[in-house]
Regions:
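Helical hairpin unit composed of two closely spaced alpha helices linked by a short loop
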Residues: 158-160
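Active-site proximal loop and beta-alpha junction motif in alpha/beta enzyme cores
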Residues: 1-8, 13-154, 164-219
Length: 219
């Protein structure tokens, strides 16, 4: 991200779940976020499962500037030269606002060019994350994400959550779960009948260090 605080971050929650499991020896832990408490579980294969809670699905929860709109299909359209226009995305809030388009080929669209325009769409007063999703023949979902305030990212856990919710609401997949393939790798996502969204994926160490907050703050 760009260093700004966010209400929720699925990837960070998964990483913290891994760190807590390693530090405490407990496979189940609770992480408190601005968006609420999230349960994290380390599975037998080492992957981390996170219960991301229930999505916000009405216009006021997204939030949208017009709270009378149906979030299943928003009146948004963007022409893209040489490609089918992007139309009627689904809006979901997973602790942060999302806009999800389902397209024939997510790879074909210049997301780095169209992302900023859609991020700042007037229907989203708090700006939005933008996702392009393709339902593949094998049932997996290819997902590319332009993250609010950050640009194109390798992976966005809350965008994967929003996408599984949108796919189920639009009846584009069979069953509750699907593998969502982001630039950085796959996540197993499920939108359960009880309304909660479950995310399962890897979390690995990149480095370890100690942060001197006094030095950082110039004290």
């Amino acid at each position: 991200g760009n260093g700004e605080p966010v209400e929720a971050c699925g990837n960070a929650t998964r990483c913290i779940g891994r760190l807590l499991a390693d530090e405490t020896g407990k496979t189940e832990n609770i992480v408190e976020t601005v968006a609420g408490q999230l349960g994290c579980t380390q599975l037998d294969d080492g992957t981390i499962g996170v219960n991301m809670g229930e999505p916000g699905l009405n216009a006021a929860q997204i939030p949208l500037s017009d709270d009378t709109l149906d979030t299943l299909s928003l009146p948004i359209s963007l022409d893209v030269p040489g490609l089918a226009p992007l139309t009627n995305p689904t809006a979901v809030n997973m602790g942060n606002p999302h806009m999800v388009f389902f397209v024939e080929d997510a790879e074909a669209y210049p997301l780095e060019e169209i992302g900023p325009t859609l991020e700042h769409h007037p229907l989203y007063p708090e700006r939005t994350n933008v996702s392009l999703a393709t339902i593949r023949a094998d049932g997996t979902i290819r997902l590319r994400v332009f993250e609010r305030g950050a640009g194109i990212t390798q992976a966005c856990g809350t965008a994967a959550c929003a996408t599984i919710v949108a796919a189920r609401r639009r009846q584009l997949i069979e069953g509750q779960a699907a593998m969502i393939i982001l630039d950085g790798g796959p996540l197993i996502m499920a939108y359960q009948t009880d309304g909660d969204v479950l995310m399962t994926g890897p979390a690995s160490y990149a480095f370890e260090g100690v942060l001197d907050l006094d030095a950082l703050m110039g004290r």
